[in-house]
Amino acid sequence: MMTLSPFLLLLIAAVVIGNASEGEVKNEFEERLKDEFKDPSRSEVAEVILLRELEVLEETLFGKEMTSDTEENRNSREKRCMGYDIECNENLPCCKHRKLECVETSGYWWYKRKYCRPIKG
């Protein structure tokens, strides 16, 4: 009981002090919110507008060719495939360049899952 009472006292003090500071946090949050709308240079709306202006400027400087090339390169990524001893199905095929195929293993009757294994033959 002697060791429990200091911890209980500490818990009560933490709860009382924690609730007292909750109002201060609300006030600080409201002040920050008001400051953001007072100073338009710091507001998120101003950042979005600036971003749009920069995109227009970039497009005029580099043209649409640059944006189309980056989109094409982004979409031409090699499709991912599963490695050895990893679960596979129609949506997640095994890697053909690693010479793996999706087969029913010995535990298929229990797990009802296929796994990537080396091609036999």
UniProtKB/Swiss-Prot annotation:
The modification Lysine amide is found at residue 120. GO terms for cellular component: extracellular region. Residues 21-80 form a propeptide. Expressed by the venom gland. Pfam families: Toxin_22. It comes from the Eukaryota. Keywords: Amidation, Cleavage on pair of basic residues, Disulfide bond, Ion channel impairing toxin, Knottin, Neurotoxin, Secreted, Signal, Toxin, Voltage-gated sodium channel impairing toxin. The keyword 4Fe-4S does not apply. Residues 1-20 form the signal peptide. One of its GO terms (molecular function) is sodium channel inhibitor activity. Disulfide bonds join 81-95, 88-102, 94-116. The keyword Ribosomal protein does not apply. Its main location: secreted. It is found in: Secreted. The presence of a 'disulfide through disulfide knot' structurally defines this protein as a knottin. Insecticidal neurotoxin. Shows competition for site 3 of insect voltage-gated sodium channels (Nav). Induces flaccid paralysis when injected into lepidopteran larvae. Is not toxic to mice when injected intracranially at 20 pmol/g. Belongs to the neurotoxin 14 (magi-1) family. 09 (magi-1) subfamily. This is Mu-hexatoxin-Mg1a.
